[in-house]
Regions:
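A structural-propensity feature for long, helix-poor, extended segments
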Residues: 51-87
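Phosphate-handling active-site elements
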Residues: 38-57
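Short, hydrophobic/aliphatic alpha-helical segments
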Residues: 3-20, 134
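Amphipathic alpha-helix face/heptad-repeat signature
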Residues: 27-34, 62, 69-76, 108-122
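Amphipathic alpha-helical interface segments
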Residues: 80-135
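Residue-level recognition of alpha-helical structural elements
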Residues: 23, 27, 55, 62, ...
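Conserved phosphate/anionic-ligand binding catalytic regions in large, soluble enzymes, centered on
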Residues: 17-40, 135
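Amphipathic, well-ordered alpha-helical segments in soluble domains
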Residues: 7, 11, 34-41, 76-79, ...
C-alpha cells in the first residue's frame, strides 16, 4: 500500500530541485487545488445528511464552485511556468526589445492578479461552507 506521503515526495523533490524551475505560482496552484478538494470533501460529508437537508442547495453550489476553482488551480501549475519563461526570455532582450519585456512583465502581473482573485474566491467559499457544512 502506497502512503500519501510517498506520493508527495516526488512533487516536493521537484520544488526543491534547482534544475527544475517551478515558479511560485505553480506552488500556489497546488495549494489552491488541495484547498478546493478539501472544500469538496466537506460538501460531500454534508450532502444527503438529514441534519443538513435545509442547506443542500447552498452546499451543491459551493461544491460546484470549488470544482471549477480546482480546475483553474490545476491549470495555473503549468501556466505559471509559461508566464515565467516569457519574462526570462524577454529579460535577456530587454535592451534591444524593451516593449517585449514590458509586455511580458505586464502579462505576469495580470496573471498574478487573476490567481490572487481566485484565491480570494476560495477563501469566500470556505467562509460560506463554514456556516452550513458538516461539523
Amino acid at each position: 500500500m502506497t502512503l500519501y506521503n510517498e506520493k508527495m515526495i516526488p512533487i516536493l523533490d521537484d520544488l526543491e530541485n534547482p534544475e527544475i524551475e517551478l515558479a511560485g505560482g505553480s506552488t500556489v496552484g497546488m495549494l489552491l487545488s488541495v484547498t478546493n478538494s478539501l472544500i469538496k470533501y466537506i460538501c460531500n460529508k454534508t450532502l444527503g445528511k438529514k441534519k443538513y437537508e435545509n442547506v443542500q442547495e447552498e452546499v451543491l453550489k459551493i461544491k460546484e464552485e470549488a470544482n471549477n476553482l480546482k480546475k483553474y488551480a490545476l491549470s495555473i501549475i503549468d501556466e505559471d511556468r509559461v508566464v515565467l519563461d516569457e519574462i526570462l526570455k524577454t529579460y535577456r532582450l530587454k535592451k534591444e526589445e524593451p516593449k517585449l519585456y514590458e509586455e511580458a512583465c505586464k502579462n505576469g502581473v495580470d496573471f498574478c492578479l487573476e490567481v490572487t482573485k481566485k484565491a480570494v474566491c476560495t477563501l469566500k467559499l470556505v467562509d460560506r461552507l463554514e456556516k452550513v457544512g458538516n461539523r
